[in-house]
């Protein structure tokens, strides 16, 4: 009865009392050795892990005790409930960070105006930093006396980006003279540079990836798309609607095709924003997951953990390089699609 009382005491209070008569001293020493070899920054998590692991082993100890002392299996329903409670407590204690935490918008300077809530957030901060960086870069390179006869690295970078976007505009937008094309060039150049620097800035540790938020990319794509539509109406008037009905379409199919083309046209803006948002968010999440996994294994004082971490570590390095390429590619894809849509609005293709 004394041992049964001790078991009940443990079950009620979720203490280690029952283990005193079950677990040998050598096992306790092994646990202590495991803790001694744990880095200080991981000690809290390690304690939680040991508690969780030993709590799950409770069913084995309880069943063995019941079979040896009472001749019947342990209370299955209680053990299942206890497991659920242990797992719930473990998840709360561990506070396992989500790979999506890096995309959280945090208010830095909260502001209230009436019933409206405004705030200066980390997203606003990094957008301003991005704009400030490339505007200052262009200013110092293009100001009077700023350009060098033999260009330095920064001037070469600006000239390279300028020529790249200019050639893109000339190649993709047809039906206009060179001077008229120049009207659209500044907007397209600023859009490309903004997206490029936002994407690349998101690769810096502890920064914020502005283009990983759907509302930001959607606002950018819709505002540009509305501008493209206005250009189409300014150039063609109501005849702009003729692009909804391709030439030579049979009359019975006309209503269906007009509706289909209208939906397709409106979804251009949606797909433009979703493509950028999805690629940036998915890539950064994958890098976060694998880097966290590799770092955890590297922190374990075990040669097998260390060797096992080398694979994920190399994958993280490869994915980081891939993400740099994706950051540049997505800015290019967004820009070239703007040029294509603008060409369609001008030439009714």
Curated annotation (Swiss-Prot):
The keyword Ion transport applies. Keywords: ATP synthesis, CF(0), Hydrogen ion transport, Ion transport, Membrane, Mitochondrion, Mitochondrion inner membrane, Transmembrane, Transmembrane helix, Transport. Signal peptide: none annotated. InterPro entries: ATP_synth_F0_asu (IPR000568), ATP_synth_F0_asu_AS (IPR023011), ATP_synth_F0_asu_bact/mt (IPR045083), F0_ATP_A_sf (IPR035908). The keyword Ion transport applies. Residues 1-97 form a propeptide. One of its GO terms (cellular component) is mitochondrial inner membrane. It is found in: Mitochondrion inner membrane. The chain crosses the membrane at residues 118-138, 184-204, 213-233, 240-260, 280-300, 303-323, 326-346. GO terms for molecular function: proton transmembrane transporter activity. CDD domains: ATP-synt_Fo_a_6. GO terms for biological process: proton motive force-driven ATP synthesis. Its main location: mitochondrion. It is a multi-pass membrane protein. HAMAP family: ATP_synth_a_bact. Mitochondrial membrane ATP synthase (F(1)F(0) ATP synthase or Complex V) produces ATP from ADP in the presence of a proton gradient across the membrane which is generated by electron transport complexes of the respiratory chain. F-type ATPases consist of two structural domains, F(1) - containing the extramembraneous catalytic core and F(0) - containing the membrane proton channel, linked together by a central stalk and a peripheral stalk. During catalysis, ATP synthesis in the catalytic domain of F(1) is coupled via a rotary mechanism of the central stalk subunits to proton translocation. The atp6 gene is located on the border of one of the mitochondrial DNA repeats resulting in two identical copies of the mature protein with different propeptide extensions. F-type ATPases have 2 components, CF(1) - the catalytic core - and CF(0) - the membrane proton channel. CF(1) has five subunits: alpha(3), beta(3), gamma(1), delta(1), epsilon(1). CF(0) has three main subunits: a, b and c. Belongs to the ATPase A chain family. PANTHER family: ATP SYNTHASE SUBUNIT A (PTHR11410:SF0). This is ATP synthase subunit a-2. It comes from Arabidopsis thaliana. The gene is ATP6-2.
